[in-house]
């Protein structure tokens, strides 16, 4: 029987904790207003993740992780045609183009990024189906959820704190009144002065 609900009632943290503690195997689909995320787990560990709007082919993930430059990415996409990610991975390894670790670490980084993005969702419908495995042509990894949950929770708290400090990105920027303070006597780097020069009531946080 599928576990279904809304993130307003059952948060991403609670979902991942349940999957982790119960050592669940299956797929989790989360649908937001504008995008959807698909995750797969095996015995409570993340094995595959996909943002429905993104190109999640192996070649593109390797390009995003800077294992392939733009030219290499384009050539491989054209040359690889319709071969699967597993086949492409083996070809790249056998040709000494990349190592197995290069490929697995790039995939792991991408999958973790999908999870971290999901932590920012406060609304959306989810459905967990038991014993559903990733497509057989995809390369899987095994990522412990414990550290992801702790890191995701930490980032969420930081974001909530930031929202308390800056409730709207449309807020105007201005200096506070400090009588006697002369900016000419302040030592700042070039980049810091660029930021200072942007502070103007006409500008917002955007």
Identify the residue ranges that each predicted region occupies.
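Acidic, Ser/Thr/Pro-enriched low-complexity segments and adjacent helix/loop capping patches
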Residues: 1-206
